[in-house]
Amino acid sequence: VTGVQTCALPIFRAIENVRILGPVRKASQVEVSATDAIKLGMKVPVRESGDVKGSAPIAIVGPKGAIYLNEGCIVAMRHIHMSPKDAQAAGVKDGDIVSVKADNERGTIFNQVKIRVDDSFTLEMHIDTDEANAAKIATGNTVTIIK
């Protein structure tokens, strides 16, 4: 055989020491940061937690075996959990999309932040590690909804 040929080999990329969290959902899901997705060599959609239909496939390997999910890997959409009382005070309702300002040395504004309201929620914004690191935000910092 002459000419240039292409050989393809399976490449195993992994993120080790991943925490498994509850509560149990209707469908298994894995939330990764955009950086994790790049490391894994995957195209992962940004979705609201629980919205896994048509999302990226992923394997989960543990000490007692492995499972393969045909779909279920997402980058979680940034969101704020709040109680109905907090929502009323902020002038927002469940499902609203707002902007949030981190008024620190990075001066970051996060757009497309979904409001999630439930009696069981404590006021807290959820962003991934990429977003937190870029904006120099840590647990306990305060941000402002600017709508």
Can you annotate each of these PLM segments?
Residues 11-14:
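Structural and coupling elements of P-loop NTPases
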